[in-house]
Amino acid sequence: MNTTILSEDKRDALQEIVNIGMGAAGASLAEVLGAFVELAVPRIDVVDRRRVPLLLDTGAWSDGEIEAVRQPFFGGIIGESLMLFDGAEPARLADLLGHAAAPTVEEQQELLLDLANVVIGACVGGIAEPLEEVVSFAPPSRLGGRPDASAFVVGDPEQGREALVINVDFKLEERRFRGRVLVFLSEPSLVRIDDAIHRFLNALAS
């Protein structure tokens, strides 16, 4: 398979669907944190799986330790989600979520997982729902340090040579909180999404 599997019209349609999904994620995050969320325009690419680790470069907004939460999803479409934070951010989560007392390290990590669960669920659900695909989620888990995408995105030959990657940066400017959401879809799911977009466009035209 090559990247032309998604025609220009279908890629444009997917971009609009992703924009809506990320908008829902921003609304969920704003509701949890009680602050306006600024979302960058999502980037969508079909890439060779060997290039996926390059997408984890967070040098544009963090040159220090990175906290990452991973959450696989499965069902009509199968993939992985990552939520990346500057390593200093978990210490601020208690204040962001309205906790008066200083949390323990374990409590900070629980807050991080809870937050990622909300945002990742909104992102993936916002993409799957318009395409009438049902997805379920595995429990989120924390990855220490800078995550190695090759460990779970590149290394499985059964998932094909290409992956669809949805990448969006977000920040709460007044709360000094920023991060990145990455959604990885394997080649078999890319074929299914192509079919789902075709049905979606036909429904709009009817």
Predicted feature residues:
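Composition-driven recognition of glycine/serine/threonine/acidic- and proline-rich low-complexity segments
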Residues: 2-206
